[in-house]
């Protein structure tokens, strides 16, 4: 669909006498354009209104996300407008989705402020999603040049250093979210944390909406949680942690909470995605300066990532967060209660953990991405998972992942500590079997049953949750046509 390779009106007399021109005529469409290594590339899924030409719609996306407005302006002549215009350079029908098109847009690097995700988002998604000629639009993927990557500090700790600090290697890390999310007193909250850590978990965590409410002030929570962490560390001889949620109404308050977490000896703090890009980059800098691991809860993402025809793919959010600088990121489970096609979720994990992402259409990765020297992010699998799924989780995601069993720990019929022990034994059994060459995909359930014979907590977990699944159709799957290079 690129037959309209060049439609720009370059004659200045005609151009500036025209008043209103189509975006393609203003220079925002160039079907012959070859993207440069230094361009920022974006792939949009667009649904034009009836009667709107897809190429004109693509040009409008390029224009409205760079320099255009609805009419020709004389001040274009005061700029290097040919360089500053984004260029839509390819439009393709989305396979199996009538009326939807993939449009590829290239942006010159000079359009963006270095080291600022806020500026990237203001340009790429700031205006075009409300544009009337489009029924819907979704940002599917982006590619950033290495030159731009190097303007970001990235994760403050990274997977390698985190494992060194924890002295834990060769297996996924285990965690749990304290439940119920809201309503516990500080003392009871701390007791839950202690039981989980003593039972074998590496981390316990606050949930996204526990901040500083009347039933439990944040200081009380921090004090009781760190008392629990220190006691569990002493009892088990392992480094333990609790994700202390420092999310607050102002940056000043977030820093105040982070400082107390540091004074109390915490190795990790947590913020929610909803604090915003500037706050995320700011607290990441603080974590880097204070040798603190930064856990990111993706609270709110589903409002704009879940529907495949409008919004932003989570793989793009994951890229922005790696650049902004987080160490942990919730990326989905594929087998739990939250939205997640297995291949698509693996694409999110690869975005976090690989130093170079190759094109992988089944996993939704449309561009090769070289991450330069940015550290890797530890993905987190959380939401409706239990010990009976351990073989699936290990098979899907490998070792570099935090597996968080909230209800699958706190809801154990023998108690919280038993729930933690069940998860730890299930994990250790799976890792041992895998290292001995067992195919976890086919033999995993049998490995669990054998381990449960000498572990009552695991046996009880399998009895209660063994058949629990969340088999619903995923709303966000990759649309692509297999090519010779992608099977």
From Swiss-Prot:
<protein>
    <recommendedName>
        <fullName>Ribulose bisphosphate carboxylase large chain</fullName>
        <ecNumber>4.1.1.39</ecNumber>
    </recommendedName>
</protein>
<dbReference type="GO" id="GO:0016984">
    <property type="term" value="F:ribulose-bisphosphate carboxylase activity"/>
</dbReference>
<feature type="binding site">
    <location>
        <position position="207"/>
    </location>
    <ligand>
        <name>Mg(2+)</name>
    </ligand>
</feature>
<dbReference type="InterPro" id="IPR033966">
    <property type="entry name" value="RuBisCO"/>
</dbReference>
<feature type="binding site">
    <location>
        <position position="208"/>
    </location>
    <ligand>
        <name>Mg(2+)</name>
    </ligand>
</feature>
<feature type="site" description="Transition state stabilizer">
    <location>
        <position position="337"/>
    </location>
</feature>
<feature type="binding site" description="via carbamate group">
    <location>
        <position position="205"/>
    </location>
    <ligand>
        <name>Mg(2+)</name>
    </ligand>
</feature>
<dbReference type="GO" id="GO:0000287">
    <property type="term" value="F:magnesium ion binding"/>
</dbReference>
<comment type="similarity">
    <text>Belongs to the RuBisCO large chain family. Type I subfamily.</text>
</comment>
<dbReference type="InterPro" id="IPR000685">
    <property type="entry name" value="RuBisCO_lsu_C"/>
</dbReference>
<dbReference type="GO" id="GO:0004497">
    <property type="term" value="F:monooxygenase activity"/>
</dbReference>
<dbReference type="InterPro" id="IPR036376">
    <property type="entry name" value="RuBisCO_lsu_C_sf"/>
</dbReference>
<feature type="modified residue" description="N6-carboxylysine">
    <location>
        <position position="205"/>
    </location>
</feature>
<dbReference type="Pfam" id="PF02788">
    <property type="entry name" value="RuBisCO_large_N"/>
</dbReference>
<keyword id="KW-0560">Oxidoreductase</keyword>
<feature type="active site" description="Proton acceptor">
    <location>
        <position position="179"/>
    </location>
</feature>
<dbReference type="InterPro" id="IPR036422">
    <property type="entry name" value="RuBisCO_lsu_N_sf"/>
</dbReference>
<keyword id="KW-0460">Magnesium</keyword>
<dbReference type="InterPro" id="IPR017443">
    <property type="entry name" value="RuBisCO_lsu_fd_N"/>
</dbReference>
<keyword id="KW-0456">Lyase</keyword>
<feature type="binding site">
    <location>
        <position position="298"/>
    </location>
    <ligand>
        <name>substrate</name>
    </ligand>
</feature>
<dbReference type="Pfam" id="PF00016">
    <property type="entry name" value="RuBisCO_large"/>
</dbReference>
<feature type="binding site" description="in homodimeric partner">
    <location>
        <position position="127"/>
    </location>
    <ligand>
        <name>substrate</name>
    </ligand>
</feature>
<feature type="binding site">
    <location>
        <position position="382"/>
    </location>
    <ligand>
        <name>substrate</name>
    </ligand>
</feature>
<dbReference type="GO" id="GO:0019253">
    <property type="term" value="P:reductive pentose-phosphate cycle"/>
</dbReference>
<feature type="binding site">
    <location>
        <position position="181"/>
    </location>
    <ligand>
        <name>substrate</name>
    </ligand>
</feature>
<keyword id="KW-0120">Carbon dioxide fixation</keyword>
<feature type="binding site">
    <location>
        <position position="177"/>
    </location>
    <ligand>
        <name>substrate</name>
    </ligand>
</feature>
<feature type="active site" description="Proton acceptor">
    <location>
        <position position="297"/>
    </location>
</feature>
<keyword id="KW-0479">Metal-binding</keyword>
<keyword id="KW-0113">Calvin cycle</keyword>
<comment type="subunit">
    <text>Heterohexadecamer of 8 large chains and 8 small chains.</text>
</comment>
<dbReference type="InterPro" id="IPR020878">
    <property type="entry name" value="RuBisCo_large_chain_AS"/>
</dbReference>
<comment type="function">
    <text>RuBisCO catalyzes two reactions: the carboxylation of D-ribulose 1,5-bisphosphate, the primary event in carbon dioxide fixation, as well as the oxidative fragmentation of the pentose substrate. Both reactions occur simultaneously and in competition at the same active site.</text>
</comment>
<keyword id="KW-0503">Monooxygenase</keyword>
<dbReference type="InterPro" id="IPR020888">
    <property type="entry name" value="RuBisCO_lsuI"/>
</dbReference>
<feature type="binding site">
    <location>
        <position position="330"/>
    </location>
    <ligand>
        <name>substrate</name>
    </ligand>
</feature>
């Amino acid at each position: 669909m690129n037959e309209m390779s060049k439609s720009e009106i370059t004659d200045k007399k005609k151009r500036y006498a025209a008043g209103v021109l189509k975006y393609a005529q203003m220079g925002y469409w160039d079907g012959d354009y070859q993207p440069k290594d230094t361009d920022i590339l974006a792939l949009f899924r667009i649904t034009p209104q009836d009667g709107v030409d897809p190429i004109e719609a693509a040009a409008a996306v390029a224009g409205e996300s760079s320099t255009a407005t609805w009419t020709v302006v004389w001040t274009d002549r005061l700029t290097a407008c040919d360089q500053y215009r984004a260029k839509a350079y390819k439009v393709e029908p989305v396979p199996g989705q009538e009326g939807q098109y993939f449009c590829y847009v290239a942006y010159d690097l000079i359009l963006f402020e270095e080291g600022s995700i806020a500026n990237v988002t203001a340009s790429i998604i700031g205006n075009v999603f409300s544009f009337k000629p489009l029924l819907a639009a979704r940002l599917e993927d982006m590619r950033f040049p290495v030159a731009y990557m190097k303007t970001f500090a990235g994760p403050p700790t990274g997977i390698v250093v985190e494992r060194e600090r924890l002295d834990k290697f060769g297996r996924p890390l285990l965690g749990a979210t304290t439940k119920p999310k809201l309503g516990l007193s500080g003392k009871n909250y701390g007791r839950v944390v202690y039981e989980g850590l003593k039972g074998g978990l590496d981390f316990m965590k606050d949930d996204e909406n526990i901040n500083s409410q009347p039933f439990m002030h944040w200081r009380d929570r921090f004090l009781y949680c760190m008392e629990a962490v220190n006691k569990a560390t002493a009892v088990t001889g392992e480094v333990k942690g609790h994700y202390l949620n420092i999310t607050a109404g102002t940056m000043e308050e977030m820093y105040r909470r982070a400082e107390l977490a540091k004074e109390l000896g915490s190795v990790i703090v947590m913020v929610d995605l909803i604090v915003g890009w500037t706050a995320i980059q700011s607290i990441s800098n603080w974590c880097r300066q204070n040798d603190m691991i930064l856990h990111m809860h993706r609270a709110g993402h589903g409002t704009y990532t879940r529907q495949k025809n409008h919004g932003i793919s989570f793989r793009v959010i994951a890229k922005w967060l790696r650049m902004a600088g987080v160490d942990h990121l919730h990326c989905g489970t594929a087998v739990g209660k939250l939205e997640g096609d297995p291949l698509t979720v693996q694409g999110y994990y690869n975005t976090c953990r690989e130093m170079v992402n190759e094109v992988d259409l089944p996993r939704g990765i449309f561009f090769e991405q070289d991450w330069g020297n940015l550290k890797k992010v530890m993905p987190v699998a959380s939401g409706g998972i239990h010990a009976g799924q351990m073989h699936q989780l290990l098979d899907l995601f490998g070792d570099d992942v935090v597996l968080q069993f909230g209800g699958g720990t706190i809801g154990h019929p023998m108690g919280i500590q038993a729930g933690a022990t069940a998860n730890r034994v299930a994990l250790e059994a799976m890792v041992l079997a895998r290292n001995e060459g067992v195919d976890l995909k086919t033999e995993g359930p049998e490995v669990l049953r054998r381990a449960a014979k000498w572990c009552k907590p695991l046996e009880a977990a399998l009895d209660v949750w063994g058949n629990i699944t969340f088999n619903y159709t995923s709303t966000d799957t990759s649309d692509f046509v297999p090519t010779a290079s992608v099977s």
